[in-house]
Amino acid sequence: MSKQVLKAELREQTGKGICRRLRAAGRVPAVVYGKGIAPVSISLGQKELSEAIAGEGGRNHILTLECAGELNGASVIVADLLRDSLKNVPRHVDLHKINLADKVKVHVKLNLVGTPAGVKAGGFLDFAMHEVEVECLPVHIPAHINVDVAELLIGHSVHVGQIVAPIGTAILSDPKASVVSILGRKGAAEEEAAPAA
């Protein structure tokens, strides 16, 4: 996963009023959490944060903070992100301070590869699980995990346990959970049950 530098400013004051003023100035209130540290309140540039978590991999990009104090040079990943429902811009973000030598747990998007044989035969694709929980070192966080569905027939499914985990990663999600299924054509059951004319 790529690393990006993000400038941050420490903030001593908290509260709704302060957060509103920060947002009006184009900044996003944030809190940094981590093992062995007390939560630290900071603010980030809205544009810079949006660009840092845009594209493939999104929230799983490793961010390096550039700021005053002990957090300068700290590596973080997004733990929780609140967006404005109308403008779709970040309103608040929780960051998790990580050690690049320690494994982390993150959610990674699944990418379906190929057109299922069952869809070509008239079936419908039911994509039930769009991401899985993965454990790995930060540098091994994948942008996505491919799931080959080209050979999937009507009535067949792919479960989490069938997904090939990228090198250096372990998938933690329930192996029995259904990821994608191919359902029969609408009305197919009725056609099969109907007597021949």
Swiss-Prot record:
It holds the Pfam family Ribosomal_TL5_C. GO terms for biological process: translation. The keyword Ribosomal protein applies. InterPro entries: Rbsml_bL25/Gln-tRNA_synth_N (IPR020056), Ribosomal_bL25/Gln-tRNA_synth (IPR011035), Ribosomal_bL25_b-dom (IPR020057), Ribosomal_bL25_C (IPR037121), Ribosomal_bL25_long (IPR001021), Ribosomal_L25_dom (IPR029751), Ribosomal_uL5_bac-type (IPR020930). GO terms for molecular function: 5S rRNA binding; structural constituent of ribosome. HAMAP family: Ribosomal_bL25_CTC. Part of the 50S ribosomal subunit; part of the 5S rRNA/L5/L18/L25 subcomplex. Contacts the 5S rRNA. Binds to the 5S rRNA independently of L5 and L18. This is Large ribosomal subunit protein bL25. It comes from Citrifermentans bemidjiense (strain ATCC BAA-1014 / DSM 16622 / JCM 12645 / Bem) (Geobacter bemidjiensis). The gene is rplY.
